[in-house]
């Protein structure tokens, strides 16, 4: 994770976000958001964008978009350009989001992802565990159905789990 600078982003960074997202998300699954969706969520309260730039890079190679609602935070999107993967960028982004979520009062960090997404290993390494499954939740561009996995990571002592 050393050598990755994390900076808070804003709507002014949407071009960088879209560049990363277009490269990172497989169009077969239709998981990427469009520009209007990114700008729309950034306009809401308690939403933040983190940008990750590895040492020596001129521009961000990854981003994370998250929000807090009451005592939970949700990692909405995390993407790293394919050529920049396996350099600790994803892990640095997860840790930055978790830290900010805790500062904002989150007790746990949630995310939802397609079953079979290779990022599952990243989330397992960074303390997430599966807490739910939605059968046939996602529909790929080829009309195939994929389960959604709900993952959670505790950020502080969660009174629900006591």
Where are these regions (language model features)?
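Acetyl-CoA-dependent GNAT
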Residues: 8-85, 91-96, 100, 104, ...
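Short glycine/proline-centered loop/turn elements that form peptide/ligand docking sites
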Residues: 59, 90, 94, 116-119, ...
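Short glycine-rich hinge loops at helix-strand junctions in the catalytic core
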Residues: 88, 127
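Conserved GNAT acetyl-CoA-binding A-motif
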Residues: 101-114, 122
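Conserved catalytic-core motifs of GNAT/GCN5-like acyltransferases
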Residues: 110-112, 129-150
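Generic structural signal for residues in well-ordered beta-strands
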Residues: 4-6
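Terminal substrate-recognition subdomain of acyl/acetyltransferases
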Residues: 2, 143-162
């Amino acid at each position: 994770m050393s050598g990755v600078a994390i900076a808070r982003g804003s709507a002014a960074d949407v071009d960088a976000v879209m560049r990363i997202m277009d490269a990172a998300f497989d169009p077969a699954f239709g998981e990427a958001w469009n520009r209007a969706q990114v700008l729309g969520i950034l306009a809401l309260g308690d939403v933040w964008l983190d940008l990750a730039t590895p040492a020596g890079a001129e521009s961000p190679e990854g981003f994370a978009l998250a929000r807090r609602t009451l005592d939970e935070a949700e990692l909405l999107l995390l993407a790293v350009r394919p050529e920049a993967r396996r350099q600790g960028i994803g892990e640095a982004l997860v840790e930055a989001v978790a830290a900010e979520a805790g500062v904002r009062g989150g007790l746990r960090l949630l995310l939802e992802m397609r079953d079979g997404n290779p990022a599952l290993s990243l989330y397992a390494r960074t303390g997430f565990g599966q807490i739910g499954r939605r059968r046939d939740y996602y529909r790929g561009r080829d009309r195939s159905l994929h389960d959604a996995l709900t993952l959670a990571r505790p950020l502080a002592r969660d009174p629900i789990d006591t």
